[in-house]
Amino acid sequence: MSSIYDLKEQAVTDTPLLLFNCVLQNGQSEYWSTHQISYGGNTYAPRVIKHNLIEVQAASDQGVDVIPRVSVSMANADSYFSELERSVGWKGATLTVTFLFYDLLTSAATSDTAVIFQGIVNSPDQSTESLFQLSAINLMNMQRVLLPPVRIQRRCPWLFPGNIQQRQDAVSGGNSGQYSLYYPCGYSADQAGGAGTMVGGVPYTSCGYTRTDCEARGMFTGPKRFGGLEFVPSSIQVRGYGTGWQYAPVDDNVAIYNDFVPLLYGTAWYYPPIVFSRNDGNLTHMEVLLGMGPIQDVRMVLVNQIQIPLGQSGKNMTSTGWYNVVSLGSRNGVFNPDCVDASGNPAGDPYGSMAYLSVVVPNQINNGQSLPTVQVLADGLQVPIYGSDGSYQNTAFTANPAWILLDILRRSGWSMANVDIASFAAASAFCDQQIQTQDLSGNSIMIPRFQCNLCLQHRRNAGDLIRGIRNGSRLLFTYSTSGLLQLQVENSIALQQPSQVAWSNSTETLNGGWPYYEFEDGSTSTANILRKANGEPSVVVTSRSIVDTPNQLTVEFQDAFNSYQQDSLLMVDVDDIDLTGQVITTSLMALGIPNYDQAARILGYTLDRAIQGNTYITLETSVKALGLRPGDLITVTYLKEGFERQPFRIVKIAPGSNYRTTKITGQIHQDSWYEDTNGQMPGNTGARPQPGSAVGVPHPLLGNTNRHEWRAAISDHGEFGQCQRRRCNRTAQRGILGSVQHTGGRARGATG
């Protein structure tokens, strides 16, 4: 049997067909096509009247470069599909669309197949006397997935496994591991190696998600899986130094309820929610929810912008306060030893699968009358890491955007069976490669090419998150011919496409790489661009208007070179401003940028694509476009516009009926945009610690009449010390203004 990529290049081919396979919720399979054929032991009914494959677009709102939606209209004069809707229901069925070449005369397939679409079926769009219309959304339509997924609430947020299949999955997560819906609870009293208790020798089949129900099922004090936050310490009579007896102030932070448990990737400063605080007369005790776990570690804690040291056993720390990491967020929670009842038994919540702190500060920092401001610098989630062969390596802390994207996908419901892990490992290796740059003092250092430090405290759709992380690291998603999701790096042609692929018609390399297809106007004896009815080539060259072409970009980030202080970078194209007389400013939708160097490289690359890459081409071709995806590099020879093997990057593909015709839109490409030095600026142009700061200690609890407010700052050696408030507020401000860099003959300026 021939390959579809060999057949598509022939002057005369067999009939190209799309095959629709739909599996309903009860396991029943339906097979349709535009023609009645037999393939793979199944008969495809000629039910499809028309179908619409929505165009595939790079950097789409769905966050992934795949067909977002399919609409199919089928013959329904006999009410066949209507009966299935009444008896079974179409909603939630899975739809797979594959492509092949088929010989209708011999009733045999003449090629292998390629998966074009995989998705979930909606409820029927409409049903008429003769037609039945269904639509399906792609599995990668991330607009329907919201992160963070867990809300702060008094009842436990973990799903309870109510039947034997769910309890089997709850033991260790089954095939989904830690991403199983039933893994956080894990009740599996009737399973080998399971957790929990039974009633009368029979496992519980339901749960009210309360503390009482959790205790009855043996999951509260045993494995400590309860995830609700309901404990509020009682007010007791206390006596502070030099004061009389009074009731201790207790602040139950009810404002956090219905907020979201933070998700922290990489390393970042953030404001974690305070669960409660209680003052004992001299000290204020707090529990602080760090986020979903397991996380790596806590580096630093500030309360009202004063640094609090890590608690040390055997030392009197009442003058400074202290913090302890009670739990890093393991599946089995940990009780706070500071919260016990009169008998010494734990009285608080175990925070199953959540990380949290116990923070104690003296009255001079906070007297318990109001909630303080708590800031934490922490190393975030430990995520699974895989080898180049796709094998699991370990679960560890990482700031690599490839593994962070995989974790987001897994939390969004994707299984490992639908992911090409080897492609993620290859992208991860590229991101981890060391490149040379300068620190804020101008010293030469080596850093990973791309990293991601991101804290999610407010819910947003996963499509925005994926697109933001991709924009900050030049990553893109595509599908393989077998239907697996792949992660690739947008790069120069030599690095992105070093070898020839099966669907390419290229016969020679271009700048060290292979174009995935070469489209020509016939000037070199080859013509594979369709012509219109009047004989004109179906080629349209366009450009964006001035107002749609930004020449000034800005991005915010926490700079790892400057102790993760909040910062921003503004980059301009001076030549374009001189040319147009206008400053067109926009904020780059990039998330997780970790340092000044990566911010400069990404802004430089984005500016180049917007201004120098402001040439787009749209052309129509035949089934020869099969195999091409957004992000691929092709060449176009169209002498009328002066294009001769000019590389373009595909940004949009719109397939027609049965893939017989395809419209392709591409953006002009230059390899120089992707060099590691593009956009880099001298390190000593960035923010530096302010001079004159020094290491100090907080005021003691008693005996000091100096009433100045002190705030955490950064010393010249990068250590946190103390400085006066007015001085510290300037540590994160950029001091460069109007510095100009010349790259590729164009003047570029940067300010911060």
Q: Locations of the language-model features?
A:
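Short solvent-exposed strand/turn elements
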Residues: 128-153, 380, 659-680
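Short, conserved beta-turn/loop elements at beta-strand boundaries and strand-helix junctions
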Residues: 122-132, 306, 652-661
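Short aromatic-centered micro-motifs
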Residues: 22-24, 37, 197, 301, ...
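C-terminal extracytoplasmic interaction modules
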Residues: 2, 40-42, 49-51, 57-67, ...
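Short, isolated positions in well-ordered beta-strands
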Residues: 30-32, 44-46, 204, 307-310, ...
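Beta-strand-rich assembly/attachment modules of structural machines
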Residues: 1-165
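Long, low-complexity intrinsically disordered regions enriched in Ser/Thr/Asp/Glu with frequent Gly/Pro
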Residues: 244-247, 279-415
